[in-house]
Amino acid sequence: MHLSAKSFLALLLLGASAANAATIDAATLTAIARLQEEKLHARIGIAVIDTASGKSVSYRGDERFPLNSTHKALLCGALLSKVDRGEFALSDTTQFSKETLVDYSPVTSKFVAPKSMSWQQVCSAAISYSDNTAANLAAQKLGGPQKVTALFAGLGDNVTRLDRKEPELNSAVPGDLQDTTTPLAVSRTLEKLTLGDALKPESRAQLVQWMKDDKVADALLRASLPSGWKIGDKTGAGAHGSRSIISVVWPKKGQPIIVSVYITQTEATLAQSNDAIARIGKSIFEATR
């Protein structure tokens, strides 16, 4: 079959529209990242994965940053992997005393013994509300931080590490390897958990739903999300101005993208860092249309 140049171009454009036409290029990502670094006097790491092509682009993508509460999405992903193996069910319950509660526990504080919580409720609290006690309960169920790190390694992630419980893991001391990841490593692990085959379909859908139900992320990537797009995310915050987010973003057309942004070593306010993440997101989203 002979195709004219015009017809061939039309086919190329059709193919491009079937997937994402493009993701942000390295030069543009570097420019926007450096602009925000200068504004915040911060260190910023970004990773974007185009799941249609498998290609990734990053800025400081292999540098370590504090995990902070972004670990909660991965933590519950690891818990779901145990559910998939039949070790327990999300409907199973746990009880805990008032002494178990730590700072920022808006959900678990309402379920102190003799009340109980299901593991479904625990992970909903940890991801959708960033409840710190819920995260500690999930980590304890998995055998503690080191066992959680081993589960990450089982997913092929030998970079991301959990060393402590909430709230100590948020110390974010510059140069400390404890409780850190890299933008690229965490993005790849998130992709495996939410879009890959690391979890069974039902568990994968549950993790995504918890992230879509995030109640504390409106000022970050969601602030610049185009109309008709969808997002599931998990934010984090810690000492030394640390602010972060990992996300799965579904454009109106095409395949999802993974977007992770980490900010640290700054005296900027939380609102300023939120705005920086929203601006970074806007540039990424505009390039993905």
Residue map of PLM features:
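Active-site SXXK
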Residues: 54, 66-94, 259
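Mid-domain, small-residue-enriched loop/turn segments at the edges of structured enzyme/sensor domains
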Residues: 43, 115, 136-190, 194-195
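Conserved catalytic neighborhood of penicillin-recognizing serine enzymes
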Residues: 101-136, 145, 179
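Short, conserved catalytic-motif segment at the N-terminal edge
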Residues: 37-65, 88
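Bacterial N-terminal signal peptides that target proteins for export
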Residues: 1-8
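Structured C-terminal helix/loop/strand segments within mature extracytoplasmic catalytic/sensor domains
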Residues: 22-39, 52, 140-141, 145, ...
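Short, well-structured active-site flanking segments
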Residues: 81-100, 145, 149-150, 200-204
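Acidic helix-start/capping segments at beta-turn-to-alpha-helix junctions
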Residues: 51, 90-107, 142-143, 169, ...
